[in-house]
Amino acid sequence: MPTINQLIAQPREVQKSRKKVPALQQSPQKRGVCTRVYTTTPKKPNSALRKVAKVRLTNGFEVIGYIPGEGHNLQEHSVVMIRGGRVKDLPGVRYHILRGVLDTQGVKNRKQRRSKYGAKRPK
């Protein structure tokens, strides 16, 4: 426990809160180019092949983004838009790729929650 004189000489430092999505730099979304599109496996109790992409953003950051929905058309050099939002069972994946924006197509045959997956209204 410091003395009052010690605290006057050197005050306590305020702890800075860590940002959850630093690569966005306070923006709601950022644009980037896919450098690698691949699948990865989730943490212990779950089992799947999750689709992810390594994305180089316009601000120079390189991040891993999750590709939601069934099926996708992404490949290397695809231009994508990312938003914040982690995937709980994939360590290091702190961003989501937006479907139906730029080079990413929406999910086919999607009937419910279409706006989340960039799907047009079925006729």
Curated annotation (Swiss-Prot):
Stored InterPro entries: NA-bd_OB-fold, Ribosomal_uS12, Ribosomal_uS12_bac
A Gene Ontology term for the protein's cellular component: ribosome
PANTHER family assigned: 30S RIBOSOMAL PROTEIN S12 FAMILY MEMBER (PTHR11652)
Record bears the keyword Iron: no
GO molecular function list: rRNA binding; structural constituent of ribosome; tRNA binding
Coiled-coil annotated residue ranges, if any: none
Lineage: Bacteria, Pseudomonadati, Pseudomonadota, Alphaproteobacteria, Hyphomicrobiales
Organism: Bradyrhizobium diazoefficiens (strain JCM 10833 / BCRC 13528 / IAM 13628 / NBRC 14792 / USDA 110)
PROSITE patterns: RIBOSOMAL_S12
Cited Gene3D superfamilies: Nucleic acid-binding proteins
Summary of the function given for this chain in its UniProt record: With S4 and S5 plays an important role in translational accuracy.
Similarity annotation: Belongs to the universal ribosomal protein uS12 family.
Biological processes per GO annotation: translation
UniProt gene name: rpsL
Protein name (record): Small ribosomal subunit protein uS12
Record's keyword terms, sorted: Methylation, Ribonucleoprotein, Ribosomal protein, RNA-binding, rRNA-binding, tRNA-binding
3-methylthioaspartic acid carried by residues: 89
Subunit structure: Part of the 30S ribosomal subunit. Contacts proteins S8 and S17. May interact with IF1 in the 30S initiation complex.
